[in-house]
């Protein structure tokens, strides 16, 4: 009987990709993490009653620096009074402002351009289309909301257990 249980445990073992493989694509990523926040991530965080900075620390453990581009801020301003609370959260002094040099660019395109040129970010979004586009860039982790908690995808030795 002892042999049968050992064989079963061997069958259940799943090979994981070593975290060193991840850093072949992105050696610039390390604590304190810089999290590039999207418009809908702020909205979903408010709907799920998750405090952004504390939720990121709970997910990743080390210190995190949430970053927001001027394109995302302008997108929140354009959405009108319905999103004024999200705009107030985005203007929090704990958020690092990233100035954009381009004019009139869609916020998702701005985020993709930024992560392609500087691979030191984790992208926080709940937008399926943007998540698909970020997955095409090697070495960029994703943060999203699932079951009223932040989750991280494609980060070696992930933060909080599920």
Model segments located where?
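Domain-level signal for Mg2+-assisted phosphodiester chemistry and nucleotide/NA-binding surfaces
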Residues: 1-95
């Amino acid at each position: 009987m002892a042999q049968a249980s050992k064989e079963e445990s061997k069958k259940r073992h799943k090979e994981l990709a070593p975290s060193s493989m991840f850093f072949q694509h992105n050696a610039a990523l390390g604590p304190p993490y810089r999290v590039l926040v999207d418009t809908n991530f702020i909205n979903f965080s408010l709907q799920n009653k998750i405090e952004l900075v504390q939720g990121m620390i709970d997910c990743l453990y080390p210190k995190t620096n949430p970053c927001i581009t001027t394109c995302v801020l302008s997108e929140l301003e354009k959405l009108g009074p319905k999103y004024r609370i999200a705009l107030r959260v985005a203007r929090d002094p704990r958020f690092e402002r990233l100035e954009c040099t381009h004019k009139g660019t869609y916020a998702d395109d701005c985020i993709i351009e930024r992560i392609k040129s500087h691979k030191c970010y984790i992208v926080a979004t709940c937008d399926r289309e943007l998540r698909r586009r970020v997955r095409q860039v090697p070495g960029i982790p994703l943060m999203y909301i699932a079951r009223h908690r932040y989750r991280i995808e494609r980060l070696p030795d992930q933060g909080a257990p599920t």
